Amino acid sequence: MIEVLLVTICLAAFPYQGSSIILESGNVNDYEVIYPRKVTALPKGAVQPKYEDAMQYELKVNGEPVVLHLEKNKGLFSKDYSETHYSPDGRKITTNPPVEDHCYYHGRIENDADSTASISACNGLKGHFKLQGETYLIEPLKLSDSEAHAVFKFENVEKEDEAPKMCGVTQNWESYEPIKKASQSNLTPEHQRYIELFLVVDHGMFMKYNGNSDKIRRRIHQMVNIMKEAYRYLYIDIALTGVEIWSNKDMINVQPAAPQTLDSFGEWRKTDLLNRKSHDNAQLLTSTDFKDQTIGLAYWGSMCDPKRSTAVIEDHSETDLLVAVTMAHELGHNLGIRHDTGSCSCGGYSCIMAPVISHDIAKYFSDCSYIQCWDFIMKDNPQCILNKQLRTDTVSTPVSGKNFGAGEECDCGTPGNPCCDAVTCKLRPGAQCAEGLCCDQCRFMKEGTVCRRARGDDMDDYCNGISAGCPRNPFHA
C-alpha cells in the first residue's frame, strides 16, 4: 500500500507580490514569492532516493492553491552519456558521470487537462508550467529564506531585444513539396523513433557563463528536458548522449555567418566527433550573434547524415524555454519539417515551427509538422533513429521497444519508484500502471480524460480508463 507523507517545506502559506526583480530567467516586472509544499508518495519501507520518481508540490499561483504533479523524465540520458572538456594545454578530457538519479521532471497541474510542466528540482524548483492556458515560470530566490521561490507569467519577463528573431532556414534550404495528408498519420507507440542527441558548447558560450561548467550543464540538461516533452507528441523520444564544452578554444571557426558556421560544424562532426562518439544528431550552442537576426540554422531532411544531421543555435535568451524551443525547431528541420504557414494550427497556441520567434511562447508542433515529420520518416526511413537507446535510470537492462520481458509488468526503474518494483519489474501492490499519458500516481486515469490535445481541425484523444496508453481517437480525419 502506498503511504502519503506530507513534508511541509515552509509554514508560510501566502504569496508575496513583487514589482521588479532580476532573476536567472531575466528581468521580471511582476512576480509572486511563494513557498511550495512537497507531498511525497513512497512505498512502505522503500529507500528514498535523492530525487524521487514521482513528486507532488502544493503551491499558490495568483493567490490560488494548485497541485503540481511531477514524474522523473526517464530516458533523458543515454546509457553511455559522456562529458568532454579541454585542459589549458588542449588535452581532451572525457568522463562518464553518474546521471541515474537526476533531477529533471515533466508534469502537469491537477484538474487542468491542458496543463504541462517541465521542471528541474536540482536546487529548488526551476522551469515552467502551463496553467489555464498561461505559461508561468518558477525559480528559487537567492534569499536567506532558502525555500522562497518566484513565480511569474512568461509575458512579464522583459524582452531582451525587440528586433524579430528568426530561423535561418529559407525555401532555398528546403526541399519544397506541397503539404498533403499523410496516410501514416494514424500512428501508434510501435512507430516510435529514438534520437541520441549530442550537444557542443563553443568557447564563447563557455566564457559567457564565466567558465562555470556546472551552470552550463544544468542549463543544457533542462533545455533537453523541454525538447523531450515537445517531441513526445510526434512519437519521437530524445536522449542526451553527450556534451562537449570547448573550454580551451573553438575547434572550428565560429563566425556570425550562420551558413558557414553550420558547414564547418558539420565537417567537424563528420571527421572528428563521429569517430569517437556514436550519436544521431548534433547541435552547436554558441554565444555568437548571428547576422540578420538569425538564431538558428539546420539542414532540412538530413537526419542520420554524417555531416548534415546538425544544427547551430545562438544562445539568444537567458530563459531556458526560449532557447530550448529554438533547439527543437532546428531539430525539426533535420526531420523534414518545414516552417508553418497560415493554414497550420497548434490548437490556438503559437507553433514551434513558426519562422519567427513569437512573444507568445511556442510549446507545440502543428498539424502540418506532424504530417511532414512522418512523411519524411516513412519515405526516407533514416536508420539511425530506429534503435531505442539504453536508459540510465534502470536497475536491470531494459528490453527494447514497449514490450516487457518474460514475467515483467513494467519497465524497471529506481528503487524509489512508487509504481514499479525495480528488482522484480512487477507493479507494486495497488498499482495499475507505472508510466504512460493515461497513468497518474500508479492508477489509470478515468475514462474521458483528455490525454492528447487536438492539432488544427483534428480531435482530442481520450483515456479509456482501462490502460495507461493514450489511444488514438477512431474519428481522427
From Swiss-Prot:
CDD domains: ZnMc_adamalysin_II_like. The active site is at E330. It is found in: Secreted. One of its GO terms (molecular function) is toxin activity. Zn(2+) binds at H329, H333, H339. One of its GO terms (biological process) is proteolysis. Residues 193-389 form the Peptidase M12B domain. Pfam families: Disintegrin, Pep_M12B_propep, Reprolysin. The keyword Phosphoprotein does not apply. It is an enzyme of class 3 (hydrolase). Its cofactor is Zn(2+). Residues 396-477 form the Disintegrin domain. Its main location: secreted. A motif (Cell attachment site) lies at residues 455-457. Its EC number is 3.4.24.-. Disulfide bonds join C304-C384, C344-C368, C346-C351, C410-C425, C412-C420, C419-C442, C433-C439, C438-C463, C451-C470. Residues 21-187, 390-404 form a propeptide. InterPro entries: Disintegrin_CS, Disintegrin_dom, Disintegrin_dom_sf, MetalloPept_cat_dom_sf, Peptidase_M12B, Peptidase_M12B_N, Reprolysin_adamalysin. PROSITE patterns: ADAM_MEPRO, DISINTEGRIN_1, DISINTEGRIN_2, ZINC_PROTEASE. Expressed by the venom gland. The disintegrin belongs to the medium disintegrin subfamily. Monomer. Belongs to the venom metalloproteinase (M12B) family. P-II subfamily. P-IIa sub-subfamily. This is Zinc metalloproteinase/disintegrin. It comes from Bothrops jararaca.
